Curated annotation (Swiss-Prot):
Highest taxon listed in the record's lineage: Bacteria
Enzyme class: transferase
GO biological process: one example: fructose 6-phosphate metabolic process
Compartment(s): Cytoplasm
Known catalytic reactions: beta-D-fructose 6-phosphate + ATP = beta-D-fructose 1,6-bisphosphate + ADP + H(+)
Protein name per the record: ATP-dependent 6-phosphofructokinase isozyme 1
Gene3D superfamilies per the UniProt record, alphabetical: 3.40.50.450, Phosphofructokinase domain
Residues binding ATP: G12, R73, F74, G103, D104, G105, S106
Pfam family, one: PFK
Residues reported in the UniProt entry to bind substrate: T126, I127, D128, R163, M170, G171, R172, E223, R244, H250, I251, Q252, R253
Annotated source species: Escherichia coli O127:H6 (strain E2348/69 / EPEC)
Record note on quaternary structure: Homotetramer.
Keyword Endoplasmic reticulum on entry: no
Protein backbone atom coordinates (compact mmCIF):
# COMPACT_ATOMS: atom_id res chain seq x y z
CA UNK A 1 0.00 0.00 0.00
CA UNK A 2 1.37 3.40 -1.01
CA UNK A 3 1.87 5.86 1.84
CA UNK A 4 4.62 8.14 0.55
CA UNK A 5 5.62 9.23 -2.95
CA UNK A 6 8.51 11.12 -4.46
CA UNK A 7 8.37 13.63 -7.29
CA UNK A 8 11.17 14.96 -9.49
CA UNK A 9 11.69 16.97 -12.66
CA UNK A 10 14.35 15.90 -15.10
CA UNK A 11 15.97 16.98 -18.36
CA UNK A 12 15.23 20.29 -20.03
CA UNK A 13 12.83 22.50 -18.10
CA UNK A 14 9.42 23.38 -19.49
CA UNK A 15 6.78 25.93 -18.44
CA UNK A 16 4.13 24.13 -16.43
CA UNK A 17 6.46 21.80 -14.55
CA UNK A 18 5.73 23.67 -11.32
CA UNK A 19 2.01 23.33 -11.99
CA UNK A 20 2.50 19.59 -12.45
CA UNK A 21 4.43 19.32 -9.18
CA UNK A 22 1.64 21.24 -7.49
CA UNK A 23 -0.95 18.88 -8.99
CA UNK A 24 0.95 15.86 -7.72
CA UNK A 25 1.57 17.29 -4.25
CA UNK A 26 -1.90 18.59 -3.47
CA UNK A 27 -3.68 15.56 -4.92
CA UNK A 28 -1.44 13.24 -2.92
CA UNK A 29 -1.99 15.20 0.29
CA UNK A 30 -5.75 15.16 -0.29
CA UNK A 31 -5.54 11.36 -0.44
CA UNK A 32 -3.57 11.21 2.82
CA UNK A 33 -0.18 10.52 1.25
CA UNK A 34 3.15 12.09 2.14
CA UNK A 35 5.25 13.69 -0.59
CA UNK A 36 8.99 14.10 -0.91
CA UNK A 37 10.41 16.51 -3.48
CA UNK A 38 13.68 15.45 -5.07
CA UNK A 39 16.10 18.19 -6.09
CA UNK A 40 17.78 18.26 -9.51
CA UNK A 41 16.23 15.18 -11.04
CA UNK A 42 17.99 11.83 -11.05
CA UNK A 43 21.22 13.47 -9.86
CA UNK A 44 19.50 14.58 -6.66
CA UNK A 45 17.92 11.15 -6.32
CA UNK A 46 21.35 9.53 -6.50
CA UNK A 47 22.80 12.07 -4.05
CA UNK A 48 19.81 11.69 -1.69
CA UNK A 49 18.84 15.37 -1.78
CA UNK A 50 15.16 15.47 -0.87
CA UNK A 51 12.70 17.63 1.04
CA UNK A 52 9.29 17.01 2.58
CA UNK A 53 6.59 18.91 0.69
CA UNK A 54 3.31 20.19 2.08
CA UNK A 55 0.54 22.16 0.42
CA UNK A 56 2.28 25.44 1.25
CA UNK A 57 5.46 24.27 -0.48
CA UNK A 58 3.63 24.64 -3.78
CA UNK A 59 1.71 27.83 -3.00
CA UNK A 60 2.02 30.46 -5.74
CA UNK A 61 3.75 27.93 -8.00
CA UNK A 62 1.09 27.37 -10.65
CA UNK A 63 2.04 30.57 -12.48
CA UNK A 64 5.81 30.20 -12.25
CA UNK A 65 7.96 28.99 -15.12
CA UNK A 66 10.85 26.59 -14.71
CA UNK A 67 10.90 24.06 -11.88
CA UNK A 68 11.48 24.99 -8.25
CA UNK A 69 12.86 21.49 -7.60
CA UNK A 70 15.53 22.08 -10.21
CA UNK A 71 16.62 19.80 -13.00
CA UNK A 72 19.86 18.30 -14.23
CA UNK A 73 21.08 15.97 -16.92
CA UNK A 74 22.65 12.88 -15.38
CA UNK A 75 23.74 10.37 -18.06
CA UNK A 76 25.40 8.24 -15.39
CA UNK A 77 21.90 7.08 -14.43
CA UNK A 78 22.20 4.55 -17.25
CA UNK A 79 24.51 2.60 -14.93
CA UNK A 80 22.54 -0.04 -13.03
CA UNK A 81 24.76 0.40 -9.97
CA UNK A 82 23.89 4.11 -9.89
CA UNK A 83 20.19 3.26 -10.14
CA UNK A 84 20.55 0.73 -7.33
CA UNK A 85 21.85 3.51 -5.06
CA UNK A 86 18.89 5.68 -6.11
CA UNK A 87 16.40 2.95 -5.23
CA UNK A 88 18.13 2.41 -1.89
CA UNK A 89 17.76 6.14 -1.17
CA UNK A 90 14.06 5.99 -2.01
CA UNK A 91 13.49 3.00 0.24
CA UNK A 92 15.53 4.56 3.05
CA UNK A 93 13.16 7.54 2.94
CA UNK A 94 10.13 5.26 3.00
CA UNK A 95 9.09 6.29 -0.52
CA UNK A 96 6.86 3.73 -2.22
CA UNK A 97 6.51 5.22 -5.72
CA UNK A 98 7.97 7.97 -7.88
CA UNK A 99 6.43 10.54 -10.24
CA UNK A 100 8.85 11.70 -12.94
CA UNK A 101 8.15 14.86 -14.97
CA UNK A 102 10.26 15.29 -18.09
CA UNK A 103 11.02 14.22 -21.64
CA UNK A 104 12.03 10.97 -23.28
CA UNK A 105 15.34 10.75 -21.41
CA UNK A 106 13.46 11.13 -18.13
CA UNK A 107 11.04 8.42 -19.23
CA UNK A 108 14.00 6.15 -19.94
CA UNK A 109 15.18 6.56 -16.36
CA UNK A 110 11.69 5.83 -15.06
CA UNK A 111 11.53 2.75 -17.28
CA UNK A 112 14.83 1.44 -15.89
CA UNK A 113 13.65 1.96 -12.31
CA UNK A 114 10.41 0.16 -13.18
CA UNK A 115 12.39 -2.76 -14.61
CA UNK A 116 14.24 -2.93 -11.28
CA UNK A 117 10.93 -3.23 -9.43
CA UNK A 118 10.30 0.35 -8.32
CA UNK A 119 6.92 1.76 -9.48
CA UNK A 120 7.09 5.01 -11.47
CA UNK A 121 4.62 7.23 -13.28
CA UNK A 122 5.88 9.51 -16.06
CA UNK A 123 4.39 12.89 -16.94
CA UNK A 124 5.37 14.47 -20.30
CA UNK A 125 7.16 17.75 -19.58
CA UNK A 126 8.97 19.22 -22.60
CA UNK A 127 8.43 22.08 -25.02
CA UNK A 128 9.41 19.81 -27.93
CA UNK A 129 6.10 17.88 -27.96
CA UNK A 130 8.04 14.79 -28.98
CA UNK A 131 6.72 12.29 -26.41
CA UNK A 132 4.86 9.21 -27.61
CA UNK A 133 1.39 8.44 -26.29
CA UNK A 134 0.18 12.02 -25.90
CA UNK A 135 -1.14 14.67 -28.25
CA UNK A 136 0.55 17.45 -26.31
CA UNK A 137 3.24 17.82 -23.66
CA UNK A 138 3.39 20.16 -20.69
CA UNK A 139 5.08 23.37 -21.84
CA UNK A 140 4.39 23.09 -25.56
CA UNK A 141 1.69 25.75 -25.75
CA UNK A 142 3.63 28.24 -23.65
CA UNK A 143 6.68 27.81 -25.86
CA UNK A 144 4.42 28.22 -28.88
CA UNK A 145 3.15 31.52 -27.50
CA UNK A 146 6.73 32.70 -26.96
CA UNK A 147 7.80 31.73 -30.48
CA UNK A 148 4.78 33.35 -32.12
CA UNK A 149 5.37 36.58 -30.18
CA UNK A 150 8.96 36.61 -31.45
CA UNK A 151 7.81 35.96 -35.02
CA UNK A 152 5.30 38.80 -34.76
CA UNK A 153 8.08 41.16 -33.70
CA UNK A 154 10.38 39.95 -36.46
CA UNK A 155 7.62 40.49 -39.00
CA UNK A 156 7.35 44.13 -37.93
CA UNK A 157 11.00 44.80 -38.70
CA UNK A 158 11.15 42.48 -41.73
CA UNK A 159 8.27 44.28 -43.39
CA UNK A 160 9.82 47.67 -42.62
CA UNK A 161 13.06 46.70 -44.37
CA UNK A 162 11.64 44.31 -46.99
CA UNK A 163 13.83 41.65 -45.42
CA UNK A 164 13.74 37.86 -45.22
CA UNK A 165 14.01 36.49 -41.66
CA UNK A 166 15.08 32.93 -40.87
CA UNK A 167 13.90 31.87 -37.40
CA UNK A 168 15.37 28.81 -35.68
CA UNK A 169 12.88 27.11 -33.36
CA UNK A 170 13.53 24.42 -30.75
CA UNK A 171 12.11 20.91 -31.03
CA UNK A 172 15.19 18.71 -31.48
CA UNK A 173 14.05 16.14 -34.05
CA UNK A 174 10.33 16.97 -33.87
CA UNK A 175 8.83 19.72 -36.01
CA UNK A 176 5.60 20.26 -34.05
CA UNK A 177 6.66 23.53 -32.41
CA UNK A 178 7.94 24.91 -35.72
CA UNK A 179 4.81 23.85 -37.61
CA UNK A 180 2.43 25.30 -35.04
CA UNK A 181 4.42 28.54 -34.90
CA UNK A 182 4.49 28.77 -38.69
CA UNK A 183 0.70 28.52 -38.87
CA UNK A 184 0.01 30.84 -35.93
CA UNK A 185 2.71 33.30 -36.97
CA UNK A 186 1.75 33.35 -40.63
CA UNK A 187 5.21 32.24 -41.76
CA UNK A 188 5.71 32.11 -45.50
CA UNK A 189 7.95 29.04 -45.38
CA UNK A 190 8.52 26.20 -42.91
CA UNK A 191 11.29 23.59 -42.68
CA UNK A 192 10.97 20.60 -40.32
CA UNK A 193 13.06 17.45 -39.78
CA UNK A 194 10.27 15.07 -40.78
CA UNK A 195 10.41 16.31 -44.39
CA UNK A 196 13.43 16.24 -46.70
CA UNK A 197 14.97 19.68 -47.00
CA UNK A 198 16.85 21.30 -49.88
CA UNK A 199 18.27 24.83 -49.74
CA UNK A 200 17.76 25.14 -53.47
CA UNK A 201 14.09 24.17 -53.27
CA UNK A 202 13.56 26.67 -50.46
CA UNK A 203 15.19 29.45 -52.48
CA UNK A 204 13.04 28.59 -55.49
CA UNK A 205 9.93 28.89 -53.31
CA UNK A 206 11.13 32.25 -51.99
CA UNK A 207 11.84 33.47 -55.53
CA UNK A 208 8.34 32.40 -56.58
CA UNK A 209 6.93 34.46 -53.72
CA UNK A 210 8.99 37.48 -54.74
CA UNK A 211 7.76 37.11 -58.32
CA UNK A 212 4.20 37.30 -57.00
CA UNK A 213 5.00 40.60 -55.31
CA UNK A 214 5.94 39.46 -51.79
CA UNK A 215 8.08 42.13 -50.14
CA UNK A 216 9.24 40.24 -47.06
CA UNK A 217 9.12 36.71 -45.66
CA UNK A 218 9.58 34.63 -42.52
CA UNK A 219 11.20 31.19 -42.75
CA UNK A 220 10.64 28.99 -39.67
CA UNK A 221 13.10 26.11 -39.30
CA UNK A 222 13.62 23.48 -36.60
CA UNK A 223 16.98 23.46 -34.81
CA UNK A 224 19.80 21.07 -35.82
CA UNK A 225 18.77 21.00 -39.48
CA UNK A 226 21.50 23.34 -40.69
CA UNK A 227 23.53 26.39 -39.74
CA UNK A 228 20.89 29.11 -39.99
CA UNK A 229 23.45 31.88 -40.48
CA UNK A 230 24.84 30.02 -43.49
CA UNK A 231 21.31 29.42 -44.75
CA UNK A 232 20.49 33.12 -44.43
CA UNK A 233 23.67 34.02 -46.34
CA UNK A 234 22.76 31.54 -49.09
CA UNK A 235 19.22 32.93 -49.40
CA UNK A 236 20.54 36.50 -49.60
CA UNK A 237 23.10 35.54 -52.23
CA UNK A 238 20.56 33.70 -54.39
CA UNK A 239 17.65 36.14 -54.07
CA UNK A 240 19.36 39.48 -53.68
CA UNK A 241 17.17 40.20 -50.65
CA UNK A 242 18.66 41.13 -47.28
CA UNK A 243 18.30 38.05 -45.06
CA UNK A 244 18.94 37.69 -41.34
CA UNK A 245 18.90 34.66 -39.05
CA UNK A 246 17.50 34.67 -35.52
CA UNK A 247 18.10 31.82 -33.06
CA UNK A 248 15.42 32.06 -30.37
CA UNK A 249 17.29 29.67 -28.06
CA UNK A 250 16.44 29.08 -24.42
CA UNK A 251 14.00 31.97 -24.18
CA UNK A 252 11.50 29.41 -25.51
CA UNK A 253 11.76 27.40 -22.29
CA UNK A 254 11.03 30.25 -19.92
CA UNK A 255 8.06 32.31 -18.87
CA UNK A 256 4.82 31.91 -16.99
CA UNK A 257 2.84 28.96 -18.38
CA UNK A 258 -0.24 29.76 -20.44
CA UNK A 259 -3.61 28.61 -19.03
CA UNK A 260 -3.77 25.45 -21.15
CA UNK A 261 -0.40 24.25 -19.85
CA UNK A 262 -1.45 25.00 -16.26
CA UNK A 263 -4.65 23.00 -16.73
CA UNK A 264 -2.92 20.13 -18.52
CA UNK A 265 -0.17 19.92 -15.90
CA UNK A 266 -2.66 20.04 -13.02
CA UNK A 267 -4.85 17.33 -14.55
CA UNK A 268 -1.89 15.09 -15.30
CA UNK A 269 -0.43 15.54 -11.82
CA UNK A 270 -3.72 14.60 -10.19
CA UNK A 271 -4.15 11.66 -12.58
CA UNK A 272 -0.72 10.29 -11.64
CA UNK A 273 -1.90 9.97 -8.04
CA UNK A 274 -5.12 8.27 -9.17
CA UNK A 275 -3.07 5.70 -11.07
CA UNK A 276 -0.74 4.99 -8.16
CA UNK A 277 -3.65 4.55 -5.74
CA UNK A 278 -5.29 2.19 -8.24
CA UNK A 279 -2.18 0.01 -8.13
CA UNK A 280 -0.57 1.10 -11.38
CA UNK A 281 3.17 1.47 -11.80
CA UNK A 282 5.41 1.71 -14.82
CA UNK A 283 2.94 3.93 -16.66
CA UNK A 284 3.17 7.23 -18.51
CA UNK A 285 0.35 9.74 -18.70
CA UNK A 286 -0.87 11.40 -21.87
CA UNK A 287 -3.76 13.35 -23.27
CA UNK A 288 -5.49 12.14 -26.44
CA UNK A 289 -8.57 13.82 -27.85
CA UNK A 290 -8.68 15.86 -24.62
CA UNK A 291 -9.02 12.69 -22.53
CA UNK A 292 -6.38 11.62 -20.01
CA UNK A 293 -4.85 8.25 -20.88
CA UNK A 294 -2.02 6.08 -19.62
CA UNK A 295 0.31 3.64 -21.34
CA UNK A 296 2.90 1.11 -20.33
CA UNK A 297 6.06 3.18 -20.13
CA UNK A 298 8.25 0.47 -21.66
CA UNK A 299 5.83 0.04 -24.56
CA UNK A 300 5.66 3.81 -25.05
CA UNK A 301 9.43 4.12 -25.31
CA UNK A 302 10.24 1.00 -27.30
CA UNK A 303 7.21 0.22 -29.47
CA UNK A 304 4.81 3.13 -29.89
CA UNK A 305 5.15 5.39 -32.92
CA UNK A 306 4.51 9.09 -32.83
CA UNK A 307 2.57 10.27 -35.88
CA UNK A 308 3.86 13.26 -37.82
CA UNK A 309 1.34 16.09 -38.00
CA UNK A 310 1.24 16.13 -41.78
CA UNK A 311 -2.09 17.93 -41.78
CA UNK A 312 -0.41 20.86 -40.00
CA UNK A 313 2.23 21.00 -42.72
CA UNK A 314 -0.42 20.87 -45.44
CA UNK A 315 -2.25 23.73 -43.75
CA UNK A 316 0.92 25.82 -43.44
CA UNK A 317 1.73 25.34 -47.12
CA UNK A 318 -1.78 26.25 -48.24
CA UNK A 319 -1.44 29.53 -46.37
CA UNK A 320 1.97 30.55 -47.75
Amino acid sequence: MIKKIGVLTSGGDAPGMNAAIRGVVRSALTEGLEVMGIYDGYLGLYEDRMVQLDRYSVSDMINRGGTFLGSARFPEFRDENIRAVAIENLKKRGIDALVVIGGDGSYMGAMRLTEMGFPCIGLPGTIDNDIKGTDYTIGFFTALSTVVEAIDRLRDTSSSHQRISVVEVMGRYCGDLTLAAAIAGGCEFVVVPEVEFSREDLVNEIKAGIAKGKKHAIVAITEHMCDVDELAHFIEKETGRETRATVLGHIQRGGSPVPYDRILASRMGAYAIELLLAGYGGRCVGIQNEQLVHHDIIDAIENMKRPFKGDWLDCAKKLY
